[in-house]
């Protein structure tokens, strides 16, 4: 079972600031069981966290979860973001394929989930398949990715599709987009 860890709390721990109650718009994402934070960086434009299985590193991984918050990127829809990423991916990896998994509104936010597959990554010589979930917030754009350097089984795909389904954005300023209460 995944335990809920809010990205805001993960960032607070990584950057040495005290954890506090959720405020304003927040990305709600879980720390996968058996994973660790392998890399985290915050700039004025972005917060990025990369998580890998405990036995792997961000330099040598077979599976990775990446969480990104693009601060103040408000006017880009998930489909526009997807189109940008697909163009970059296709240029970097000939023969890439793309598939929209779902698109809609979750907690009143536009969202889209899609996959991108590179048959052979030029840098690693291995295939790479990445699931993406993008959420257009009022304050920022949120992106969560699950990447594999192998072809996942149907069971693995189901587990991680469910993981992405649980990724949400909430806003303490809006009664129609409530954040979870502290326990």
Residue ranges and their predicted role:
Residues 63-106:
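Mid-chain, structured segments of secreted extracytoplasmic proteins
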Residues 21-40:
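Short N-terminal segments immediately surrounding and downstream of signal-peptide cleavage
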Residues 5-14:
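Bacterial N-terminal signal peptides
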Residues 15-21:
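Sec/Tat signal peptide C-region and signal peptidase I cleavage site
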Residues 126-141, 147:
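A short, surface-exposed beta-strand/turn
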Residues 88-133:
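Signature of long, low-cysteine stretches enriched in small and polar/charged residues
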Residues 139-183:
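Surface-exposed amphipathic alpha-helical segments
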Residues 34-74:
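Secretory pathway targeting signatures of secreted, lumenal, and periplasmic proteins
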């Amino acid at each position: 079972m995944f335990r809920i860890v809010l990205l805001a709390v993960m960032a607070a721990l990584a950057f040495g600031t005290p954890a506090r109650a959720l405020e304003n718009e927040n990305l709600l994402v879980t720390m996968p069981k058996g994973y660790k934070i392998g890399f985290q960086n915050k700039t004025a434009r972005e917060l990025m966290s990369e998580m890998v299985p405990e036995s792997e590193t961000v330099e040598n991984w077979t599976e990775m979860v990446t969480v990104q918050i693009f601060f103040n990127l408000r006017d880009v829809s998930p489909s526009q973001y997807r189109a940008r990423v697909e163009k970059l991916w296709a240029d970097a990896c000939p023969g890439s394929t793309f598939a929209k998994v779902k698109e809609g509104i979750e907690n009143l936010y536009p969202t889209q989930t899609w996959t991108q597959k590179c048959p052979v990554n030029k840098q690693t010589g291995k295939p790479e398949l990445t699931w993406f979930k993008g959420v257009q917030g009022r304050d920022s754009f949120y992106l969560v990715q699950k990447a594999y350097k192998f072809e996942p089984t149907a069971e693995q795909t189901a587990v991680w599709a469910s993981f992405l389904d649980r990724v949400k954005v909430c806003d303490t300023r809006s009664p129609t987009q409530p954040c979870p209460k502290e326990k």
